Amino acid sequence: MQRNLVVLLFLGMVALSSCGLREKHFQKLVKYAVPEGTLRTIIQTAVHKLGKTQFGCPAYQGYCDDHCQDIKKQEGFCHGFKCKCGIPMGF
């Protein structure tokens, strides 16, 4: 039952995030929907980690460049799931 709830919450968060809702909205939803305990802590941690990622980075080649040009007027590079402005990949 708890696994189904977690999957349902995750899919709901993914669907709502495409509508422009931010991490704080999801944290509030988790706070009221999930009882206090270990499960809530795990879900809140997952929401925070997902909120920090930029999924367009690996999926769309020019996402980071467009993102960094808008913000800092620098060239953008994809580092995993995060865009870094002006910091090239160092292998």
UniProtKB/Swiss-Prot annotation:
InterPro entries, alphabetized: Long_scorpion_toxin_alpha/beta
Pfam families xrefs: Scorpion_toxin_alpha-beta
Location of this chain's protein in the cell: Secreted
Tissue expression: Expressed by the venom gland.
Cysteine-cysteine disulfides: 57-78, 64-83, 68-85
GO cellular-component term (any): extracellular region
Pro-sequence residue ranges: 20-27
UniProt signal peptide: 1-19
One MF term in the entry's GO annotations: potassium channel regulator activity
Ranges of residues in domain BetaSPN-type CS-alpha/beta: 54-91
Keyword terms: Disulfide bond, Ion channel impairing toxin, Neurotoxin, Potassium channel impairing toxin, Secreted, Signal, Toxin
Similarity annotation: Belongs to the long chain scorpion toxin family. Class 1 subfamily.
Its job: Inhibits voltage-gated potassium channel.
Protein's name in the database: Potassium channel toxin Meg-beta-KTx1
Native organism: Mesobuthus gibbosus
